[in-house]
């Protein structure tokens, strides 16, 4: 297989997975902030947890060049579709589409149509995304586009080297995302005031939902959402498809 074809398939896998991961992070964080429990007496605890998302995506430096503060509007705008963010959902879908456009004879028509449709629907007309429930709907659409593309690829792409390069890109991006999540989650727990321990269950739930693992974890463990158990599940579980 030519190196250009292999590289493009690899990056298509990464970009599609990156768009899905970013959409999941935004959507889960949006709902987590809305539903965050009030902890009486917990001073100095920030209820809005938007800044950690920048650490997850390694975008904080670039973000600070355009915004003064990280909040529920600036971070979603940056991660979803800001034109200067090369890792945004919009940029990831656009790059995946561009790579796929040069491989029209190597991928199925259905794969191309799915990518092209996602690009047209999610990369334009984003003015109202940050209004009311627009962010949730946008993130759901991005995740569903990724799921649809992965399902069609699984059903239509021959199991030759091209398939394995596409899969390698997807899996490496997925592993990188899980490891970043666990690292930031560990940093959030360091030095946490005892009165704020009530937030631990809430944060654990958000972490698991960010990688679509909450239900799978609950079926395996009928106990409190302890950080150690969550980390072990996401790192070592042999049956969960998103574990490292």
Feature names for model-found ranges:
Residues 1-244:
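Alpha-helical transmembrane segments and their helix-helix packing motifs
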């Amino acid at each position: 297989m030519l190196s250009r074809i292999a590289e493009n398939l690899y990056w298509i896998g990464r970009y599609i997975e990156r768009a899905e991961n970013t959409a999941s992070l935004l959507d889960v964080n949006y709902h987590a902030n809305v539903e965050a429990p009030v902890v009486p007496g917990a001073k100095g605890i920030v209820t809005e947890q938007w800044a950690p998302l920048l650490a997850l995506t390694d975008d904080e430096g670039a973000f600070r060049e355009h915004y003064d503060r990280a909040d529920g509007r600036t971070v979603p705008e940056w991660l979803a579709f800001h034109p200067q963010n090369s890792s945004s959902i919009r940029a990831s879908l656009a790059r995946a589409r561009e790579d796929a456009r040069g491989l029209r004879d190597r991928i199925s028509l259905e794969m191309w149509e799915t990518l092209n449709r996602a690009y047209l629907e999610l990369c334009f007309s984003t003015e109202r995304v940050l209004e009311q429930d627009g962010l949730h709907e946008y993130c759901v659409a991005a995740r569903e586009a990724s799921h649809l593309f992965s399902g069609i690829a699984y059903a239509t792409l021959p199991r030759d080297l091209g398939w394995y390069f596409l899969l390698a890109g997807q899996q490496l991006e997925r592993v990188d995302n899980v490891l970043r999540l666990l690292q930031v989650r560990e940093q959030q727990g360091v030095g946490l005031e005892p009165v704020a321990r009530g937030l631990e269950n809430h944060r654990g739930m958000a972490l698991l939902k960010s990688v679509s693992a909450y239900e799978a974890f609950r079926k395996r463990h009928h106990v409190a959402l302890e950080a150690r158990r969550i980390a072990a599940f996401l790192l070592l579980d042999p049956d969960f498809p998103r574990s490292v």
